[in-house]
């Protein structure tokens, strides 16, 4: 806390860092649990304190900056976001502790499967290669979430990191992009968990992952309909959670495996509840704080918009090739209609469609070519105005 105070970081910087830490902690907690990696579990635990410290500082700095009732009302979105990012990180730590406490005798996997895959890969391409160079040589974009060297984990390693044989990297991206990256570093993408109770556990983890970025998108766009989708998914999550809970209890798994899975499932439920709370200001018609637009353009995984022009009209999302460049389409705004997670191989785009996209920091130059930052900000402001009129 004292170090953060000395650094004098702004609310914008603190919230941005909290988003990155919470997302990374959530994703790595799942990978740590399913792979049985104790050192990765401990890395997740360290994130809990980091976000809690930032939460307290956000309250202090934002309270000092409030000068009017309007300022206070806009600050609600910041407070709700930061409070629930802290809760999400706490729940991620509980998933890590579920493994550390119970050491469940479950099948081990080195991959978490979803809209994107998160996978542990051994580096075998020789000493001296820089991470950024390796990524550029593959022609695709993945996010290297973490790097393990000996017993130390480095979260979000910089692109100038020099890799060594024996390192372990955690990569995230589309399955095609991750396979290309794995091939370049002399590794192979393992099979993900399929079916069974562990497979069902990761089905609900996928729902939570979708909710994470939809809740941030709803906040950025001030979009009721996106917020309502988060609420609906939270209801789906409740149903899945109850069914999985019964399946775990009635299974023939060992007592420690049951305890670990139940504890982790409860943690996912808490994350789902927190994501639901993040969109509360939107549903209550409270104006979002203007710094949110800047925050979501600066995180490691960013959220913004791209408008479809005549050149790309008629193409499917898959034909745009975004999945190769680390870009995921979360939703499409077509006129007054919102479509969440449309099928990438079947949904055909029309001129004027606005894509709500999530992309890696490394994809910024690609997204900038598709839509300049200035144009993206104008599109978001127009959506804000439309949502306020509705």
Where in the sequence are the language-model features?
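Cytosolic, long alpha-helical scaffolding segments
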Residues: 1-390
